[in-house]
Amino acid sequence: ETKPSSRKPAPPFTTSTLQQEASRKLGFSVSQTMAVAQKLYEQGHITYMRTDSVNLSQLAIGAAKAVICNTLGEKYSKPRNFATKTKGAQEAHEAIRPTYMDKESISGDKNEQQLYSLIRKRTLASQMAEAELEKTTITIAITGEKHTFEAVGEVIIFDGFLKVYMESFDDEKEDDEAALLPAIHKGDQLQRSLIQALSI
């Protein structure tokens, strides 16, 4: 059973979302994230890292579009403006983004390189096309058994922004519901690779 679906990219980073994502993806503490971001800012690699704005300048949006079109093709590009919902947000500052969008990597220690890459990918993804998915339920029957297994998740039809960046979540349940499944067809035979017993 399949239903068409789509997934939009997350906005570029604010201070708090950068801290959360760096913790989930890189294992950084809040203080570590801010110390590394401070270095990146001082070296001219990123915009100011203390902001609660998700806005990008028109210059940044144009630069992101150029990188996306040149590396992935026009179908992956979808320039967009994000609105900052926080009252009294520091609109004077942009979201946290690379100073130069076309700069894929930087010199520096491993932490600096990892955080820069995270910021760049999130920024580019925010300016990319939605992912087109099919919400899918797969029912697996076992020969000679009356019980069936069921897998619920999503199959990617067009990867869009997911080609560059996938957001993490703290809640495992949210992750499970959005699990990506391989494209299969009715009647396909599956090979057993692992059986794992879990208590619920």
Where are these regions (language model features)?
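Generic preference for hydrophobic/aromatic residues in regular secondary structure cores
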Residues: 46-48, 83, 93-97, 149-150, ...
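Conserved nucleotide-binding/hydrolysis micro-motifs of P-loop NTPases
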Residues: 52-56, 102-103, 155-156
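Short strand-loop junctions, especially beta-strand C-caps/beta-turns
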Residues: 21, 49-51, 99-101
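Acidic, turn-prone loop/beta-hairpin segments
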Residues: 82-105, 110
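Extended, well-ordered alpha-helical scaffold/bundle regions in very large, multi-domain proteins
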Residues: 28-90
